[in-house]
A protein has these predicted regions:
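Secretory targeting and sorting signals
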Residues: 1-24
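Glycine-rich phosphate-binding loop signature in dinucleotide/nucleotide-binding domains
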Residues: 73-76, 165-171
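Domain-level recognition of soluble alpha/beta enzyme cores
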Residues: 193-220
Length: 229
């Protein structure tokens, strides 16, 4: 099973999601996009290093296609963000070119580090890399990936990225991140996500979630699209 499939299977364990309260802060919209296919994806090995591998020729096609897809809906973005990893920045570039501004790099959008499991086969990730994230989704956020982060540390840094986007003044932002990071954070924090559906059809390269909300009152799923096929 691929890392994408394993992450999806783990998310079914996360059944209790954060419900929004009466809004006390203005809401914004954030579209979280998974990066296009990278050389790491194509290799079948876990690669969470920074800056990490580039996207493949197929990945470039996917990056172009998701830009057309998002802009084709008549959506006008006023902010663009990417992680510290080159594959998200390359995926963001066609959108950045269309917007006429470079992506702002946010460390909190980076992939969950594999720690001691870096470079191991993706097929084994369910018994290695994803053991701790499975515990996060079951409520134990103190579980740590050996040589990497625990659930509280991961959640805090992604929260900080979302806070930075909110504080920027952008009201319709697009942010490029990573499969495990997006799916895990969304399952932990976003109202309206169906873990069973996500488990059966995990986020593909250039798949995305559109969220509405704010860091104080919480986030709600507006729509999702598993773009790359």
């Amino acid at each position: 099973m691929s890392v994408r499939g394993i992450v999806g299977a783990l998310l079914i364990a996360c059944a209790v999601l954060t419900a929004p309260t009466a809004a006390a802060e203005p809401d914004i919209t954030v579209t979280l996009v998974r990066h296009a296919q990278s050389a790491g994806n194509a290799s079948g090995l876990i690669d969470t290093s920074t800056p990490g591998p580039s996207i493949t020729p197929l990945g470039q096609e996917q990056a172009d296609a998701v830009t057309v897809l998002l802009r084709g809906k008549g959506t006008v973005f006023d902010g663009i963000y990417a992680s510290t990893m080159i594959r998200t920045q390359q995926t963001a570039q066609p959108m950045a070119d269309a917007m006429g501004e470079p992506p702002t790099v946010l460390p909190g959008l980076r992939e969950i580090e594999a720690g001691v499991y870096e470079g191991e086969p993706e097929i084994a990730a369910g018994a290695t890399y994803f053991q701790a994230p499975m515990q996060w989704l079951r409520g134990d956020r103190t579980a740590r990936i050996p040589g990497s982060v625990d659930g509280n540390e991961f959640d805090a840094r992604f929260d900080q990225a979302m806070q930075t986007i909110y504080d920027s003044g952008d009201r319709n932002a697009v942010a490029y991140s990573h499969g495990a990071a997006i799916m895990t954070w969304v399952a932990m924090n976003v109202h309206g996500v169906d873990p069973a559906a996500l488990a059966s059809d995990p986020l593909r390269n250039t798949g995305y979630f559109v969220l509405r909300g704010n860091p104080v009152d919480g986030w709600t799923l507006v729509t999702e699209n598993n773009a790359a096929r």
